[in-house]
Amino acid sequence: MSKLSTTKICVKSPAKINLHLEIIGKRKDGYHELAMIMQNIDLSDYIEFENNQIGEIKLKSNSKDLSLDEDNLIIKAANYIKDMSKNKELGANIFLKKNIPIGAGLAGGSSNAAATLVGLNKLWDLDLDYETIFILSAKLGSDVPFFIEGGCQFCFGRGEILEKYSSNFDFGVILLKNPNISISTVDTYKKYSQEFCPKYFTETEKTNKIRNDLRVNGFNDFKLSEQRINVKNDLQVIVERENNSVKKALYLLSNLQNCLSYSMSGSGPTCFALFKDINIANEVFEQNYKMFNNNGFEAWVCKLINSGITLL
């Protein structure tokens, strides 16, 4: 194997929240047709990649709760991009510093997969273009493509059809999650499908109308003031009804001073509240941190960021 120009790199792998999650219908391929607005936040994992000379992918992490086997999306992504390179001699030692909670609805695993594609493309001097990386990312999961560019985007289809949302949002965010709770995304979508299937739209015309309505309305008419704003998550009705911890988190967030809106992210169980800016969010966070902990929640304060995966 010829000597590679890069021996070690670090990649920032941020979380996301859903500002809008609407289930339109069921696709022929079994996935759900979605209309979403996804937004990156600065709660991030960090992944170090270092070349090795044994042609193997080795993964370690500071997290004791994370599987480091072949089912880990980092390993899957590394094998995908290695197979594409057709170079069996390529190898990497990977260390994941895990800060994003696992199974939380913040897409930490999807973000890590995207970070692996971007990181190894650089480390191994593969020079794969954006389109190729994007196609690879879509094979790994519905949320993975979003993180390649990130920021704030409309996400349609099963999540792989992306349109940049040129927003000027500067919200501060407080996150709450019960550390003892994780929720199956597959099961949650299945339960939603069973209950609301008669309401599904399958016609292209109606699907396009919902997409266009979201493009036109979104948060464009929102003026930063004391008013509440609408954040939508169709899965919340299922999870909140079956999970007292999520119901409690939403109640606590709804009663925070200066809260503009609150919702569940993805399929949960993490819930979030939006504030006018990070300074207000920090102040509210400091005032209520003990209360969050006393009620059994881990809590974070974050700001929105305009990028996804970042090479450091």
UniProtKB/Swiss-Prot annotation:
Enzyme Commission numbers on file: 2.7.1.148
Primary enzyme class: transferase
Catalytic reaction list: 4-CDP-2-C-methyl-D-erythritol + ATP = 4-CDP-2-C-methyl-D-erythritol 2-phosphate + ADP + H(+)
Pathway linked to the protein: Isoprenoid biosynthesis; isopentenyl diphosphate biosynthesis via DXP pathway; isopentenyl diphosphate from 1-deoxy-D-xylulose 5-phosphate: step 3/6
Active-site residues from the entry: K16, D143
Binding sites annotated in the UniProt record for ATP: P101, I102, G103, A104, G105, L106, A107, G108, G109, S110, S111
HAMAP family assigned to the protein according to its UniProt record, in alphabetical order: IspE
Family, as annotated: Belongs to the GHMP kinase family. IspE subfamily.
Function according to Swiss-Prot or TrEMBL: Catalyzes the phosphorylation of the position 2 hydroxy group of 4-diphosphocytidyl-2C-methyl-D-erythritol.
Classification via NCBIfam families: ispE (TIGR00154)
Protein name, entry field: 4-diphosphocytidyl-2-C-methyl-D-erythritol kinase
Native source species: Prochlorococcus marinus subsp. pastoris (strain CCMP1986 / NIES-2087 / MED4)
